[in-house]
């Protein structure tokens, strides 16, 4: 299943990410089963800027959440994937890599502009299928 979460500011996205990690932890999801993917360099990601103490930028240890660029995670997978920093789906092939990495649950934190673009892309795809 996919859960989309809309944000309107960087601060709101950061808070949503922190809350999501806390919620997953309360549900019993182990940190090593969570990966945060970003289209940006990990050091430029909201996950790094909010200072999540459990985020590891290198291969994950027993208690860490891996933070990686979408491109660097190609060919890998995780039970739970969180895609952060989504402001546009202009590079859809990159996002396709990210959205296909989750084996159990996918969360996408997206801006309002990205949401509108995603809906437009879905409509275009559906219209093409009807032709």
Descriptions of predicted regions:
Residues 1-131:
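Core RecA-like ATPase module of SF1/SF2 helicases and allied nucleic-acid translocases
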């Amino acid at each position: 299943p996919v859960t989309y979460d809309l944000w309107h500011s960087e601060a709101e996205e950061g808070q949503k990410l922190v809350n999501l990690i806390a919620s997953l932890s309360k549900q019993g999801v182990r940190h090593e089963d969570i990966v945060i993917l970003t289209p940006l360099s990990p050091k430029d990601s909201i996950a790094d800027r909010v200072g999540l103490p459990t985020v590891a930028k290198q291969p994950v240890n027993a208690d860490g959440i891996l933070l990686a660029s979408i491109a660097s995670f190609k060919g890998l997978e995780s039970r739970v994937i969180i895609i952060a920093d989504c402001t546009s789906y202009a590079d859809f092939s990159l996002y396709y890599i990210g959205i296909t990495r989750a084996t159990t649950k996918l969360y996408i934190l997206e801006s309002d502009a990205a949401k509108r673009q995603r809906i437009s892309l879905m409509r275009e795809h559906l219209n093409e299928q009807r032709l």
